Amino acid sequence: MEARDIILRPIVTEQSMAEMDNRKYTFEVALHATKPQVRKAVEEIFGVKVVNVNIANVRGKKKRQGRYEGMTRRRRKALIALSADSKEIKIFADEDNDKK
């Protein structure tokens, strides 16, 4: 399995943005991904040293559209802590490069 298939997208919330100052990043990962696979994928993609990986399964929520009821899809998110000597992950592109 490719590293890009394991790490799907960053999760951008107020809480996850605040944790970035402490070198903790939150990503949505594949449903079948394990902690060692997530660690290896992050180290391979971003070139950083991972200290800890925590994973949480998020249940789908019930949603209604008129009289029809359905479920949102379930997700799996990983909270990744980096070592103090590793570089930070650039999730957003620099605005200076976009303006050129």
Swiss-Prot record:
One of its GO terms (cellular component) is ribosome. SUPFAM superfamilies: Ribosomal proteins S24e, L23 and L15e. Disulfide bonds: none annotated. Keywords: Ribonucleoprotein, Ribosomal protein, RNA-binding, rRNA-binding. It holds the Pfam family Ribosomal_L23. GO terms for biological process: translation. One of the early assembly proteins it binds 23S rRNA. One of the proteins that surrounds the polypeptide exit tunnel on the outside of the ribosome. Forms the main docking site for trigger factor binding to the ribosome. It comes from Lacticaseibacillus paracasei (strain ATCC 334 / BCRC 17002 / CCUG 31169 / CIP 107868 / KCTC 3260 / NRRL B-441). Belongs to the universal ribosomal protein uL23 family. GO terms for molecular function: rRNA binding; structural constituent of ribosome. This is Large ribosomal subunit protein uL23. NCBIfam families: PRK05738.2-4 (NF004363). Part of the 50S ribosomal subunit. Contacts protein L29, and trigger factor when it is bound to the ribosome. The lineage of its organism: Bacteria, Bacillati, Bacillota, Bacilli, Lactobacillales.
